[in-house]
Amino acid sequence: MSELSYLEKLMDGVEVEWLPLSKVFNLRNGYTPSKTKKEFWANGDIPWFRMDDIRENGRILGSSLQKISSCAVKGGKLFPENSILISTSATIGEHALITVPHLANQRFTCLALKESYADCFDIKFLFYYCFSLAEWCRKNTTMSSFASVDMDGFKKFLIPRPCPDNPEKSLAIQSEIVRILDKFSALTAELTAELTAELSMRKKQYNYYRDQLLSFKEDEVEGKRKTLGEIMKMRAGQHISAHNIIERKEESYIYPCFGGNGIRGYVKEKSHDGEHLLIGRQGALCGNVQRMKGQFYATEHAVVVSVMPGINIDWAFHMLTAMNLNQYASKSAQPGLAVGKLQELKLFVPSIERQIYIAAILDKFDTLTNSITEVSRVKSSCARNSTNIIEICYLVSRSRK
């Protein structure tokens, strides 16, 4: 019998109770202790979680990258162990199960299971169901200086409790769902690691052949040494308020909006049309280069590049990437690239025919190297399975009525 068939048998005819999130959890907002008070951060032993913890260490966490001192805790009260953190502003929907007493920054809302429901739920079952909550959050945001979740609706989000009149069977069902999803998670992690290693090898191959193709003995190849300003036009994009950007494409928000590190969301109006390159202008990742075709909006944190006649835009993309423009960033708290400085950089420009030849070869490697969507699909599969399997609770119960 398959695992899903077994789960359906376990669920046969059971009732599902749907409870508002605020009835199941105590909600508390995170905060950042004052950075000016050194005693709040010196010799800290209390885990203080940020988005970086999830990005670097996953969704089930028992320690944090940064720690704070006990004197930094408001009212001396920590978030309890085995509670769930979910981001309700900025990068919305990211969540993690925290297995130790802790605190978090203001981007997170802590979901701590109420004592009255402590014996009714498996916290890991609720953690997996938060993938569905996360999707709801991303679709229900309010816009001000930055995106934030509609908290009134958030508190009303419904949580399923299978077989509410039989606590023992309810926990057995939840435990079985968790077991299946744990297996999905393990397989996902294994496959993701394999794919990431494969992509790393492809990247090394691409870099090697790119460097070989873009390195010339100038006396052996037709061409001239020029500055970037001689072969391309560079101009910073235009400022746009954060409240005019939404996360997903919909209705009149049809134009992708690019900042210094890639796409930020979608906007109503375009700033550019055609075939261009975008160079990240500000931030730790400034100097990254992307190709863009069609209609889009570029913010002031991106440099929009248009090539001159006699320059192949795909060759220019690979050349700029190989130049590692990040090395020319200002050494400050907020690294940045000056357009004027970029325009003065020199390089050897071969004939247009050789540019096209080089670009065609490197594009093939680039396609192989950047199969990141494959990894992204694998990483998101567990989230989809979490929602799909848990929703069997609802579907099976309805089919038996």
UniProtKB/Swiss-Prot annotation:
Gene3D superfamilies: DNA methylase specificity domains (3.90.220.20)
Bilayer-spanning residue ranges: none
Keyword Isomerase: no
Pfam families hit by this protein: Methylase_S
GO biological process: DNA restriction-modification system
GO molecular function, one term: DNA binding
InterPro entries xref list: Restrct_endonuc_typeI_TRD (IPR000055), Restrct_endonuc_typeI_TRD_sf (IPR044946), Type-I_RE_S_subunit (IPR051212)
Keyword DNA-binding (UniProt): yes
Domain of life: Bacteria
Family (UniProt): Belongs to the type-I restriction system S methylase family.
Subunit: The type I restriction/modification system is composed of three polypeptides R, M and S; the restriction enzyme has stoichiometry R(2)M(2)S(1) while the methyltransferase is M(2)S(1).
Functional note: The specificity (S) subunit of a type I restriction enzyme; this subunit dictates DNA sequence specificity. The M and S subunits together form a methyltransferase (MTase) that methylates two adenine residues of the sequence 5'-CCAN(7)ATGC-3'. In the presence of the R subunit the complex can also act as an endonuclease, binding to the same target sequence but cutting the DNA some distance from this site. Whether the DNA is cut or modified depends on the methylation state of the target sequence. When the target site is unmodified, the DNA is cut.
Domain notes: Contains two DNA recognition domains, each specifying recognition of one of the two defined components of the target sequence.
Additional record remark: Type I restriction and modification enzymes are complex, multifunctional systems which require ATP, S-adenosyl methionine and Mg(2+) as cofactors and, in addition to their endonucleolytic and methylase activities, are potent DNA-dependent ATPases.
Protein name per UniProt: Type I restriction enzyme EcoprrI specificity subunit
Organism: Escherichia coli
Gene field: prrB
